[in-house]
């Protein structure tokens, strides 16, 4: 969950202002996890990993990062796996498919268009429920949630 929280804050900042100031990410993470030096340090380590992987880039100013490489994800099994990982950090283990796949924590990825039923076909650990004409709810299968 910690990595997802840092990725979410970085993705939100990229959408809002186009840059990711490390101090803002650290402050927001400390609001969630407590004002301890270890929280701030670990957030910095996660950001450094994002830099090492190329999904964030150094900008001209120290401690301010910009969008790096965006990875196109077309493999349905990989999309299902990433969706499942995102569900594990959500309370209740469920969420609307569109919201989930467009979430800020997935800022390094561009997903191929997918249908909800194809995700459940790609993973035996996910269920899909239709909520309306154009709304699908993705959930972790019950037997999986306590493992």
List the model feature ranges, each with a label.
Residues 1-20:
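A glycine-rich, hydrophobic loop/mini-helix early in the fold
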Residues 2-3, 70-97, 147:
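Short, amphipathic alpha-helical interaction segments positioned at domain boundaries
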Residues 24:
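Ca2+-coordinating acidic residues in Ca2+-binding motifs
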Residues 27-38, 98-114:
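Short helix-coil junctions and helix-kink-helix linkers
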Residues 36-49, 108-122:
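Short amphipathic alpha-helical interaction segments
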Residues 51-61, 123-133:
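A short, conserved structural fragment
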Residues 58-74, 136-137:
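Accessory beta->alpha helical hairpin/"wing" motif in late/C-terminal subdomains of nucleic-acid enzymes
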Residues 140-147:
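Long, low-complexity, charge-rich intrinsically disordered regions
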């Amino acid at each position: 969950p910690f990595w997802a929280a840092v990725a979410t804050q970085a993705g939100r900042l990229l959408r809002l202002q186009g840059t990711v100031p490390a101090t803002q990410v650290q402050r927001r993470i400390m609001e969630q996890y407590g004002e301890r030096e270890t929280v701030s340090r670990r957030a910095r380590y996660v950001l450094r990993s994002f830099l090492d992987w190329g999904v964030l880039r150094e900008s001209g100013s120290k401690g301010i990062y910009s969008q790096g490489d965006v990875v196109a994800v077309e493999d349905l099994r990989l999309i299902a796996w990433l969706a499942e990982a995102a569900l594990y950090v959500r309370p209740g283990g469920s969420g609307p498919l569109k919201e989930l796949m467009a979430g800020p924590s997935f800022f390094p990825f561009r997903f191929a268009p997918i249908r909800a039923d194809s995700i459940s076909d790609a993973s035996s650990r996910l269920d899909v429920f239709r909520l309306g004409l154009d709304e699908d709810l993705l959930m972790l299968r019950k037997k999986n949630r306590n493992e």
